Each structure stands twice: as structure tokens, then as C-alpha cells.
């Protein structure tokens, strides 16, 4: 394994071994229900997580939201989201890998037993989980930075974990929320503090709900425009759906382009999309999902199921590779 976690100047960092890529495995949309009705699907999802982690040979696992699915009204999960969260965390802890999460829109639905603050306390108490609740004065729970350092102590890449929030009001029908202005300012301040000699620090961002510019870039790519570059994966949601916020204008992507720090964004949310492409200098990637529960009939589909590998090199460059569950032994 490459990379060791340390505390330096009061914050957690990862120190990368020279000459070896630091590998992150992105998992997303596990959707553990935790109810009697979802027992078999939960078993399949947790077995898939275990198989993918064992095959990935990753130094760190980043889970980009919707670990659980407390949807009792649809008989797709118990409102006791602590139970389902424990089911997922116990598998990760048993594997002994360093891991972390950001929240999706489903982890703490309005009828769920625990809110994000309480779930955050649980995650941060796990031995191998590196989740941080972040500054309580900033919107959301789980806005935090883990710097990836080179052996000489210089910054390689800032790993930025962001709560992309859930809904505009208390329920799904109000539409998806955006990353808020104060979260964007927090990101900028973190990067400014990590930057040296006028060179903007490189960063990768991990969050759940995609920005609208992901679809904008895909449409340009689909039309053969040189403004966007296709790398791998597919858009398989019905009618080429991208689940970005439709009723509120998000500023995150545009501000990241201006900042010049963020080289990659890794998301989930749309379970059938696995697209990875570059638009306006930022690699936009839908992680392969796990879900056997939330989408009707998804247990019988498999082309979208798996993990996503991110290999970061000494100079801060990185590669992205899809790891389908079907390729895992």
C-alpha cells in the first residue's frame, strides 16, 4: 500500500511514497435499505463492495454519497438509517482499508432517524474512516480537505470533500440543492492556504450531485465539439438524464474554472451514468454505482455496477479507470 496518514500542523494529511501512484477507489450510491424487504439486495450490494475493494488494491476509498436509502414509504429501506449505515460501515471496517464518505441526498431523508450531524459523528468515530464534519459555520456537513503530500512535504494534490446538499426544502419534490456560496469560498480559502510561490495548488473534488455543466460538456462532446474531450463510460439514464439542480443556479463549476485549482470532480447520484470527460480543463467523472435497490429493475442490470480508480502520480497528474464488478474475481 502507498500512503500513510499523519497529523501535521493540527490537520490530517496523507504522505505519498515517491515513485508509486497513490490510488483512490471511488464508490458511490450503495443504497443499503436495512429492512427485511431489502435484505437480499443489501447482501448483494455489500458483497459487491467487498469484492471491488479487494480487487482495487486502493490506498484510500472515497464514497460519494447515498450510502444508505431510508425510504420506508416505498418499502425500500428502514427509517432507521443508523442501522443501514452500520451495515455499510461494518463491511468497510472489516476490510481494514482507509476510507471516507460525503453525504448524498438520500442518506438523511426527512423521515430518517438520524440527521447528517448525527451520521457524521458515527462515521468520524470509525477506526479507519477519515470523515470530518468540517466547520459548523459553513453550510452542509462534511466539507473538509485532506492534503496529499509528497515525501518531501510538498503538496501533491488537495483532496476536497464537499457536501453537495440535498433538496431546496425538506422534500424531494422541491428540487435538488446546489453547493452554496460559503462552501465555494471555503474551498477557495483552503486552496489559497495550500498554494505556494504564486502557483495554485492542484485539487480533486469529491461530492454527490453533479453540476449542470456536466451535461453541457457532454452535449458538446456528443456533437463532436473540440471544447470537450470524451475519455470513457456512458450516459445510460433514460432520455440522457443528468440529475443536476434544475431550479437553482449553481456557481461551483464556474468558480472552479476561474480558480484554476480543481483538475477533477468525482460524483455519483445518477446510477446508470458512468461518463468520464474533460470540459473547460476539469475532468468530470460519474463513479460506477453499486445500487441494487433504488432504481426499479436495477438489480438485473450490470454494466453500470463497479468502482472507479484514480491513480495520482508524483507530479499531481492522474488517470481514471473504470473497474466494473464483472471484471472483479
What are these regions (language model features)?
Residues 33-36, 69-72, 101-113, 167-170, ...:
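Active-site environment of divalent metal-dependent phosphoester hydrolases
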Residues 2-16, 82-199, 292, 305-311:
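Extended active-site neighborhood of metal-dependent phosphoesterases/phosphodiesterases
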Residues 1-82, 87:
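N-terminal active-site segment of His-dependent metallophosphoesterases
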Residues 2-3, 12, 145-153, 251-259, ...:
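Binuclear metal-dependent phosphoesterase catalytic core
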Residues 21-34, 156-166, 206, 283-289:
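Active-site-proximal beta-strand elements of phosphoester/diester hydrolases
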Residues 37-41, 65-90, 107-128, 217, ...:
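Metal-dependent catalytic neighborhoods of phosphoester/phosphodiester hydrolases
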Residues 56-60, 158-161, 173-270:
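His/acidic metal-ligating clusters that form di-metal
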Residues 29, 49, 61, 66, ...:
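Divalent metal-coordination and catalytic microenvironments
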